[in-house]
């Protein structure tokens, strides 16, 4: 969302850019982080003309039933479900500003969409990041944001007058990396390019137990259909699905192999 206003006889209108998916008139959306109640889409406009649906890439205006103008601020996100906000993100960061160098810890400003947050940048795979280089980083946001794997962002200097570079979110629900072991770097490197099966496998390794597709979707800010597609495309059956009364349950192949060895022993 980049703007909001009230129209007599219609109520609150918000404008912004559609980042993904499709939205239709009478669909239900949620304002992330502020208003958890469902909001109905009364009317949609795209480039000034009323339309029945909007999709990724469109500039759009939404007239929302049940939303008070005072609840809206620039940088908020509308989605078809309630997303998990995070203040800790693993990402890639490419530094483009000339004659600039970042140390292992640096203060900066993080911008994603129209949202802006103060951030501490922690380099994971090196001690210095220079102009023209790309690093694996963990970003510590001062205030949480609803972010997803694959989201792109820009980083500016702490006074927000120079753009330092940009990057892409790899993992929006990581552990706090106090150390930088080789296995962490290898795991994050496998996430570059947003391979969804690897991200789901990482979530299962962190949990050290089977997880439902619903749990994984909630943790990663995905929908359950995306999790199901990850299972279908996982290489060499690394993700093993089970249909249960609670729905789809996923187990990593390594978890099953370890369990089998324990039972045999």
What are the functions of these language-model segments?
Residues 1-99:
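Conserved catalytic-core segments of large NTP-driven translation/proteostasis enzymes
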Residues 47-52, 66-265:
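C-terminal effector modules of nucleic-acid-centric enzymes and ribosome-associated factors
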